[in-house]
């Protein structure tokens, strides 16, 4: 007669901690680089900052949402500033190029925060995509 094999563990998964803290605990520790490129993408709803090395490999990224801002507060200039400070402090940059894309309200605040942080900026480039009379824009909102 066959002997029953005892089960180790159960099928139910036990959730440890809260859901909102799960993202921060899963994040890898960022590589520390001295020279890199800071990409600032400022939309009307959010500000996303990506730090890459000179070859273009992503080292760290941060957005207003990951810094703790929700809903319409993500679009504020203060959220853009906090996002920029968070991204630079984590990586420890000394020299950088800045690529700015978009026309959101966090754009200037993020740029000001990067300049004040002590990082030497070699160039600031605006890479906002501009159509050469391409697609028809959406109709204006009527509120």
Swiss-Prot record:
HAMAP family: Ribosomal_uS11. Part of the 30S ribosomal subunit. It is found in: Plastid, Chloroplast. PANTHER family: 40S RIBOSOMAL PROTEIN S14/30S RIBOSOMAL PROTEIN S11. GO terms for biological process: translation. Keywords: Chloroplast, Plastid, Ribonucleoprotein, Ribosomal protein, RNA-binding, rRNA-binding. NCBIfam families: PRK05309.1. GO terms for molecular function: rRNA binding; structural constituent of ribosome. The keyword Cell membrane does not apply. The keyword Lipid biosynthesis does not apply. It comes from Brachypodium distachyon. This is Small ribosomal subunit protein uS11c. GO terms for cellular component: chloroplast; ribonucleoprotein complex; ribosome. Belongs to the universal ribosomal protein uS11 family. Pfam families: Ribosomal_S11 (PF00411). It comes from the Eukaryota.
């Amino acid at each position: 007669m066959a002997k029953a094999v005892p089960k180790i563990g159960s099928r139910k998964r036990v959730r440890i901690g809260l859901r909102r803290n799960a993202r921060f605990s899963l994040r890898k520790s960022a590589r520390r680089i001295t020279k890199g490129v800071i990409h600032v993408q400022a939309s009307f709803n959010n500000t996303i900052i990506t730090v890459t090395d000179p070859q273009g490999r992503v080292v760290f990224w941060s957005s207003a949402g990951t810094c703790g801002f929700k809903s319409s507060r993500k679009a504020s200039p203060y959220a853009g500033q906090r996002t920029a400070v968070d991204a630079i402090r984590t990586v420890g940059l000394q020299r950088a190029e800045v690529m700015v894309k978009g026309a959101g309200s966090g754009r200037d605040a993020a740029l000001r925060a990067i300049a004040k942080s002590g990082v030497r900026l070699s160039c600031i480039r605006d890479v906002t995509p501009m159509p050469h009379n391409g697609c028809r824009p959406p109709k204006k909102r009527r509120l």
